[in-house]
């Protein structure tokens, strides 16, 4: 298959790398987590991608009727310097060569005017205040959100029109599964909050994150400053 996917299409099984493991079987990920929400975003060094990666980590426990994985157009070996198996609560698939992006016909845009929403501009503005410098003439991958069944069948697809046109957080993913009647039956109660998420390091051990030092959410200092060493070397990717 090649080209844009729609509900009813079927993704091929493939092997993928993460920053902490190589040649993982996509078949196994689906078997363990379907219905799987699979979100494709730009490279992991981009402030928008980093913002949503942090947001998904913070709200991960709000998604309890399916699984989630994030795909980024970055090299696994470079991300391995700051991302280990316990850094994120969800799998981070690395596709630096864009094999899946090309297979699924994910659009690219050159320059920010055609790819940035208002939220994306706000994220980029804050990132620049903290030292981020976007590459000149860089091509940006627009996002794609899929929900996949255990055999790789596409249950839902949405090609984003801007860099932030993805589920806002994991609670939004849960709501989408329920709206589409795809929620996996659960034997346990819905978690009340995210207070027990354990992916964060002590605040005095974690660096500040360039581009994510939000002035608008000072009550959430823990999250904004201790998403581990997640993004320490990413800007070079």
Language model features with spans:
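N-terminal "domain-start" segment that seeds a small globular fold
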Residues: 1-28
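Short loop/turn microsegments at loop-to-beta-strand junctions
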Residues: 11-12, 37, 142-144
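Thiol/selenol-based redox catalytic cores and closely related redox-interacting motifs
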Residues: 95-165
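A short, polar/charged loop-to-alpha-helix boundary motif
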Residues: 163-179
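Cysteine/selenocysteine-centered motifs that mediate thiol-based redox chemistry or coordinate metal-sulfur cofactors
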Residues: 183-237
